[in-house]
């Protein structure tokens, strides 16, 4: 009896072999990603956010909205940046009772998400009613995209030598899960609450992919639309998106209302906004370079097979896959092809269209499932009794070029990672100075940029500034994301100019010991091949004046700030007021000049003498700064951190307004006399109320999803 029952199970077990091999391959080749090494890519930024959320929670601050002082002269990243993936790490580490370090949990979650991606693809495709053979094949090939660092599903986007796009790993999983659950709800009315939760999680994990999911969901909605189901399908579609939007409104609503304080770097390459155009993308697709860079175009061939099968079979799954692929391929062409037509898209002005490759990759996996299912049927007609072995052999043969290419890629990744890890471990001087910096009084640290000797302070592929980020040491360094309005001005910092140390509050410098340094720097310590210097920075506060006022667009701010910096007006104590379009600036007696005209206006401006007075004492914490000030003249007290209205100031215990000053600093007007000034970061009350509302709605949905005897709830659309 046992052998008779086991016999039909043998082909089914054999069919899983390619997927198991893919999982094992990823599990082994990605093991180096578990090493606790500083990151040289955006994962350094992501882990800094994890550390910041953990510190905020430990210190009694709001983990959903806190000030991070380390990069870009400070910024409240979680107010604008997707944060569920980061908060999840903090929660997991606490569930482990702190026995496992944050960086270990961070790397482990990254590793498991990368290794487990095929399982999410398989589950989602089966939920979408793709064939078993097609789902297994697509899941098997899911981790084997090779796009030559194209920012898509290829693991080049995630590994140590890649881009470190941690939140996109979550978005890959959630995009498939959302599509599957949405389909289930729209078609059968099942999984309403899981669909809402998945969409909400995607919104909080990756805004661009949530935007892309809205477009994919519209395609899904249209593919299954008939005259008989139009009303019910429309109600379900509207309900699931409305509920997910309400749950996450604490994030996207304040984001929209205060986006004027979010930087938009002019240094970001134009192709990231515009994409590459139809000709370049179609050439890459036809040559196999889009999915199979540097190897035989096996995935490209399966995508082509899927397109052919979709045209011939026209099943619901085939039509969905084909429609999604065409939609995303057309959108991926970007502004180079479509020009002003793309202005019809919501939020078109801030779309980074090169990331639409993610939609192309997701649709490609659906087409691979269609094509593989078609080949499975062909194998059944060709070899009726050997359908499974023949198909498995074909799949393994198709995997071989991908396995060879990916193995070479990951081996080089391991070489780079190991080289850098050993260099850091063997460099005792760097560790000594990092520990010294932890004990020194507050002040930012400069360890070079890519435009000066900073490029020579390397540990394999890591820079010294990467170690500063890992150790949460506030620094003037190359921006990772350019979220702050001050971020791009940091490229203008000149270590040879003593004024810049005052303007940016750079108190410490780490430089190569053999590098000639300016005489105004005081040597504190030499360790190994580095020397630590101290400069006169004036601290986080400065006394100044504000004799000019400008008003204009955010895009005009950097030009004004660079002109102000070039004229050394900050060191002279002149900090003009700035009101950006969309800001609510306090009233002023000054006449506002056009911000676009600031470079000309500042070029001929002579700063008046500094107001008489002094800063007797000052202190700095991550969420709070304070100063004791003695003034003989009216003055503007300047806090040299990025301006944001969530900073609330009190003078002698009385709340006072703050103003935005060039470059994007905080200003507080003071009268003559002795004053105690406190400036603290406070999350907006409305955002905290929206968080409570979202959590309450989430709990309510879960409760209502439980089986009930009351019939009314079961008749939701």
Q: What annotation goes with each model-predicted range?
A:
Residues 324-328, 443, 647, 654-656:
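A structural micro-motif
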Residues 590-709, 713-716:
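Active-site-proximal, structured, solvent-exposed surfaces of multi-pass membrane proteins
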Residues 352, 537-544, 637, 674-678:
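Short, charged/polar, Gly/Pro-enriched secondary-structure boundary elements
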Residues 56-57, 119, 207, 400-632, ...:
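Extracytoplasmic
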Residues 39, 81, 114, 426, ...:
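Charged, low-complexity surface patches
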Residues 328, 357, 531, 625, ...:
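A broad, low-specificity signal marking well-ordered, structured residues that form hydrophobic/aromatic
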Residues 2-421, 432, 441, 508, ...:
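Membrane-embedded transmembrane-helix bundle of lipid-linked glycan/lipid transferases
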Residues 212, 254-255, 368, 455-456, ...:
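Short helix/loop capping segments that flank catalytic or ligand/cofactor-binding pockets
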């Amino acid at each position: 009896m046992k052998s008779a029952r086991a016999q039909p199970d043998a082909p089914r077990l054999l069919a899983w072999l390619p997927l198991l091999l893919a999982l094992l391959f990823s599990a082994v080749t990605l093991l180096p990603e578990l090493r606790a090494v500083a990151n040289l890519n955006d994962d350094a930024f992501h882990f800094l956010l994890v550390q910041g959320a953990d510190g905020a929670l430990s210190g009694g601050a709001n983990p959903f909205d806190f000030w991070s002082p380390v990069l870009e002269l400070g910024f409240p990243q979680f107010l604008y940046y997707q944060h569920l993936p980061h908060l999840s790490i903090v929660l997991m580490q606490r569930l482990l009772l702190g026995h496992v370090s944050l960086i270990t949990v961070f790397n482990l979650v990254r590793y498991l998400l990368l290794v487990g991606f095929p399982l999410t693809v398989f589950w989602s495709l089966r939920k979408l009613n793709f064939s078993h053979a097609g789902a297994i094949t697509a899941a098997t090939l899911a981790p084997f995209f090779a796009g030559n660092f194209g920012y898509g599903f290829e693991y080049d986007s995630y590994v140590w030598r890649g881009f470190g796009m941690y939140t996109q790993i979550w978005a890959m999983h959630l995009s498939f899960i959302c599509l599957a659950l949405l389909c289930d709800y729209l078609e059968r009315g099942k999984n309403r609450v899981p669909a809402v939760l998945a969409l909400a999680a995607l919104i909080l994990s990756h805004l661009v992919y949530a935007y892309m999911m809205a477009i994919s969901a519209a395609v899904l909605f249209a593919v299954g639309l008939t005259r008989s189901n139009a009303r019910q399908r429309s109600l379900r579609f509207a309900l699931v998106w409305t509920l997910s939007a309400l749950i996450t409104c604490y994030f996207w609503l304040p984001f929209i209302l205060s986006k004027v304080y979010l930087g938009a770097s002019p240094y970001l390459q134009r192709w990231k906004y515009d994409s590459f155009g139809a000709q370049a993308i179609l050439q890459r697709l036809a040559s196999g370079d889009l999915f199979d860079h540097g190897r035989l175009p096996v995935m490209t061939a399966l995508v082509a097979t899927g397109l052919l099968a979709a045209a011939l079979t026209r099943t619901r799954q085939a039509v969905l896959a084909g429609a999604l692929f065409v939609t995303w391929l057309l959108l991926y062409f970007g502004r180079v092809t479509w020009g002003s037509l793309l202005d019809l898209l919501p939020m078109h002005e801030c779309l980074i269209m090169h990331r639409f490759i993610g939609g192309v990759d997701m649709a490609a996996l659906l087409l691979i499932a269609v094509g593989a299912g078609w080949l499975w049927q062909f194998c059944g007609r060709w070899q009726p009794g050997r359908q499974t072995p023949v198909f498995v052999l074909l799949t393994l043969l198709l995997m071989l070029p991908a396995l060879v290419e990916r193995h070479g890629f990951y081996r080089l990744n391991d070489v780079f990672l190991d080289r850098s890890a050993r260099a850091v471990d063997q460099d005792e001087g760097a560790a000594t100075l990092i520990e010294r910096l932890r004990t020194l009084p507050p002040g930012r640290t400069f360890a070079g940029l890519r435009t000066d000797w900073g490029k020579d302070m390397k540990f394999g592929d890591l820079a010294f500034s990467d170690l500063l980020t890992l150790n949460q040491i506030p620094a003037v360094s190359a921006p990772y994301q350019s979220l702050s309005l001050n971020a791009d001005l940091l490229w203008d910092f000149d270590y040879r100019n003593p004024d810049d140390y005052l303007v940016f509050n750079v108190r410490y410098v780490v430089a190569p010991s053999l590098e000639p340094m300016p005489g105004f720097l005081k040597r504190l310590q030499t360790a190994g091949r580095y020397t630590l210097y101290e400069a006169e920075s004036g601290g986080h506060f400065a006394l100044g004046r504000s004799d000019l006022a400008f008003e204009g667009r955010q895009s005009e701010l950097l030009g004004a700030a660079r002109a102000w910096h070039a004229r050394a007006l900050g060191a002279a104590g002149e900090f003009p007021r700035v009101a950006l379009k969309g800001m609510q600036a306090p009233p002023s007696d000054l006449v506002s000049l056009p911000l676009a005209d600031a470079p000309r206006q500042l070029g001929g401006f002579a700063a008046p003498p500094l107001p008489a007075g002094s800063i007797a004492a000052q202190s700095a914490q991550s969420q709070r700064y304070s100063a004791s000030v003695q003034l003989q003249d009216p003055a503007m007290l300047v806090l040299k951190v990025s301006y944001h209205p969530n900073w609330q100031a009190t003078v002698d215990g009385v709340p006072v307004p703050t103003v935005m000053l060039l470059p994007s600093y905080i200003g507080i007007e003071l009268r003559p006399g002795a004053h105690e000034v406190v400036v603290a970061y406070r999350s907006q009350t409305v955002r905290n109320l929206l968080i409570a509302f979202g959590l309450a709605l989430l709990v309510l949905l879960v409760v209502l999803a439980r089986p009930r005897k009351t019939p009314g709830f079961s008749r939701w659309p």
